[in-house]
Amino acid sequence: LPICIAATLEKKVHIVLSDSGTSLQPFVDMFHNNPDYDDDLIINGQQAIEMVGNNAVLVVVDVNKPSITDCPELLRLCKSIVVFDHHRQGTEVIENATLSYVEAYASSTCEMVSEMLQYIGENIKIKNIEADCMYSGIMIDTNNFMTKTGVRTFEAAAFLRRNGADV
C-alpha cells in the first residue's frame, strides 16, 4: 500500500521487517533486485527507530496487536499511525492510531488495500511487483481462493490482475 501512494506523493517509504523468514524472502529479493526501488526500501526495526522523525507516518498492516508488530517501539515513537487489518480486534489494540481500519469480514488485508486503491484515483500507479505481492497475500489468506472469499475478494483480485499481477 504505501509504496505506490508514497511514490505518487513523492514521499520516501520504508518497509520494516525484522525477519523476513523463508516465506517472505522471495518477495524481499524481488524488491532488492529491482532498480525501481531504493536499496533501503526494506529495513529492520532498529534502522526504522533511528530514522523516525516528527513527520513520519507509520502504516501497520495485517496486525492490530502492538505485541506482535515487528517493532513495537515504533508505535511509541510515531505520532501518526494508520492501521489496516482484517483480524478481529481483541483486548490488546494499537490505541494511539490516527486511523484504524479493521474489517474482520475481509478475506485479507491485501483485499482491503486493493479496494482502497481502486477509489483513490487514476493517478495512483501500482507496479507489477506490488500487484504481485498483494495478489499473493490474497491467495495465502484465502488458501488459493478456497476459504473466506466473497465477491469483494474476486473484485480485488481482478483489479490486481488488471494492474499487472501475474502470479
Residue ranges: model-predicted function:
Residues 20, 66, 145:
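Glycine-/small-residue-rich active-site loops that bind phosphorylated ligands and cofactors
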Residues 1-54:
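Anionic-ligand anchoring segments at beta-strand to alpha-helix junctions in alpha/beta enzyme folds, i.e.
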Residues 3, 28, 71-75, 157-158:
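Short amphipathic alpha-helical segments and helix-helix/interface helices
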Residues 25-28, 64, 131-133:
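Charged/polar interaction segments and conserved charged motifs
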Residues 26-27, 71, 94, 148:
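Short, well-ordered secondary-structure micro-motifs
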Residues 1-11, 88-167:
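A structured phosphate/pyrophosphate-recognition subdomain
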Residues 37-99:
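Active-site cofactor/cluster-binding pocket
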